[in-house]
């Protein structure tokens, strides 16, 4: 009996010694490298990132600074990550598994890999995929916190955008040529006020006809007093510097099919049309003209009843008992009801995703069966589709983004420094034993 107790005590002692030894090793591996407000950076995190950076550098034949300098950079990054992670928790920012999976899928696609191949590549490089996945989540949270915090500190004025647009246009305008059509409605050299008024009335009528789709060349041949009238008013291809100043100021950066005028000159009233453009990147986007009827479910109107109600409207339209416009005015909820559900011309991408998806499957003049969006239940009538020149809007967006990015880089650094200055950060010296 004594022997058994002694054996148990000895075994217990060995277990305690082993546990103590393991704990000591764990403490050595997971020693606190830094305290960041209410969080910590562990030595194991520092070492893992150091190993990962060295592996990537070796793979890319990239030289690295000394271990000491590299460790300082790694510590800075992990401290920043900890700060931003804590801020993200306070702000309620969460990255769902679905968002994370989508990001990883995009990363794999950029490397021209399937997700399974991408995962294996991470494992082959000596990193746990689960750990890699969580690191990506941390990066996404950090990015969201940074963007939310820095964005509100940046202001880009319309004047700044206009100034940059002018510079961008000057740099590219010499390469752009416009194919112009010209109609001149003459008035006498010694024109009276009546002559001027009559010429302007004729010119205004010509512009109205052109805007309604009349043939430019035909009107030029019959009405223009310009030397090129018999050529359909064709002035040929000209860049901005080759045009009369009065024309160039009005034509510059205008899209194809733009009609400018009437413009009063010494000879009469000029009407100019941009027949075509070359040498400029033209971006066209599709717009749709649609009408809809919206029914919002409520406590007294279930989803099923809302859907059934809309299907009934479609049946009435098919039977010729009512028009879409009449039903929209009577039943649709929202501001478009007074217009018979007319949404006007718009880029379909600007609508709710479910609405955009529904429009993509429709043909001109067709109706879409009832479907659910974030606003409620809809039926749609697609009136028409068209392609429009979105170059000017694209350039404006690009100019804004350039200015925003310039300011973002500087402001992000300033904001992060302020955030670190306000935080409690204690870095512990590395134990070299």
UniProtKB/Swiss-Prot annotation:
GO molecular function: peptide binding; peptidyl-prolyl cis-trans isomerase activity; unfolded protein binding
GO cellular component, one term: outer membrane-bounded periplasmic space
GO annotation, biological process: Gram-negative-bacterium-type cell outer membrane assembly; protein folding; protein stabilization
Top-level division of the source organism's lineage: Bacteria
Domain PpiC: 175-276, 285-384
Subcellular location, principal: periplasm
Signal peptide feature range: 1-24
Localization terms from the record: Periplasm
Name of the featured protein: Chaperone SurA
Native organism: Colwellia psychrerythraea (strain 34H / ATCC BAA-681) (Vibrio psychroerythus)
Gene that this sequence comes from: surA
